[in-house]
């Protein structure tokens, strides 16, 4: 009876696969078996408890009680005598969202979807809600289990039980790799294999991946893949932030993603599904037994499981080819050219994916685990050193609980953000080979801020210093320099020297600049304590062009002097002023 029921469930799943385009959104949607349904319910209940009580945990008794009510409620069976747990609606919503985000359907969803197909319902008419309930709850195998309790436990039986546990673990790991290869959104499968073999990706790495997946609303595997692709191909401009917590796990994540890429390459490059399936299993097996002792039970279990699955894949492919041959006897062998092109390019590896889906469906239709406590709470590190239970992996602190220190002041937060921007700009900026002759951007910005905030040296002083290179006071108390009257004069000897030099070098641009600079050195300012009045600067007769340029420079000096508010004399200027006043 048990075998018949399991075969009927497998036929139901096959019917679902034939009509996947009308029943689901993706061909790679995987079916969630009884054990995976119970694990998903456990995580949903723990998440609900965390939202209401703050602790990501749930007791075994509550899970068993909720599991019983969940099966009756979802199969539309009477639930009068079953106690319902608090917040069941929230738990059910979390469960449905988890399966939807993981691109999975449980056996009850498959049964309901197939029930809507009225044309082919006779293929699984022997499946009723009550029988499906008995299968999922394990009642179909209760009679077989009664004989086991009467037998005494011997050392040999204990040894056999340990070997069976190791073999089940190896089987679960290999199936999880195949499941993730087919369905990249399956977070439950990723939790089983993220750190097997050891990649340094423990609870902390899984917690960081989970937080990033929630922020980006993506699956954990896609978040890890996106992060590694950004590191490898993005460049400095698109590199993740230096404070990204995933940077601490680059080595392990890169190892994991590259291994999955290797499996994807085999899936896409090898057209023969039988050969591709064998190579995929061989690569997974070599990865798991690398560095292991050949006498280790886990080593032997991995080899046995890989060999068994390889044989099952070959049988599945042979049966599929036989079904295709029978179904196409009355169809013309001529195919459109587009059909050939699509199957040769875009759908490369599709036959292998179909074979792997059948293998995963057979596992989903298998009987549930007898020991629920061992399934839900037993840490896998008792068998494998890097194994951790799923509940332990998903139990993590929220991002708000990572740092319990009080919020920093606004000034410190602004300063920190500005420093991060400066670091990022320095990393991405392209500098010239002569950049050493210029000031850094941060120094220039600092000088600008100092000039703006300084009350004693306004910005107009900078313009004066650019106009007059030497000898001009940049902080005279608002004088107006003109040509009509004043009390500043040039010495006779100096005037004769300037006249001779300007007359001999007329027309030379560099000489004109020297002449202007020499004239500027002799422009002296009075004491700022004197009352405001017009000043005069007597200039020797020179060429007309030189005179116009000098007048324009003096006017600019006059405008800039209006902005000054304080006297500031250079060294020796007082003596020169007294000398020329004589």
UniProtKB/Swiss-Prot annotation:
Q: Which InterPro entries match?
A: P-loop_NTPase (IPR027417), PARPBP (IPR038932)
Has UniProt tagged this entry with the keyword NADP?
Answer: no
The biological processes this protein is annotated with in GO are:
DNA repair; negative regulation of double-strand break repair via homologous recombination
The ranges of region (Disordered) come to 471-514
**What are the recorded GO MF terms, alphabetically?**
DNA binding
Q: Which SUPFAM superfamilies match?
A: P-loop containing nucleoside triphosphate hydrolases (SSF52540)
Q: Name its cellular compartments.
A: Cytoplasm; Nucleus
GO CC, any one term = chromatin
Locate the compositionally biased regions of type Polar residues: 471-487, 501-510
Keyword annotations = Cytoplasm, DNA damage, DNA repair, DNA-binding, Nucleus
Highest rank taxon of the organism: Eukaryota
Q: Does the keyword DNA-binding apply?
A: yes
Main location class: cytoplasm
Its family remark reads:
Belongs to the PARI family.
The job of this chain, per UniProt, is described as:
Required to suppress inappropriate homologous recombination, thereby playing a central role DNA repair and in the maintenance of genomic stability. Antagonizes homologous recombination by interfering with the formation of the RAD51-DNA homologous recombination structure. Binds single-strand DNA and poly(A) homopolymers. Positively regulate the poly(ADP-ribosyl)ation activity of PARP1; however such function may be indirect.
Its assembly, as annotated, is: Interacts with RAD51 and PCNA. Interacts with PARP1. Interacts with TASOR.
Protein name listed in UniProt: PCNA-interacting partner
Source organism of the structure: Bos taurus
Lineage, broadest ranks? Eukaryota, Metazoa, Chordata, Craniata, Vertebrata
What gene is behind this protein? PARPBP
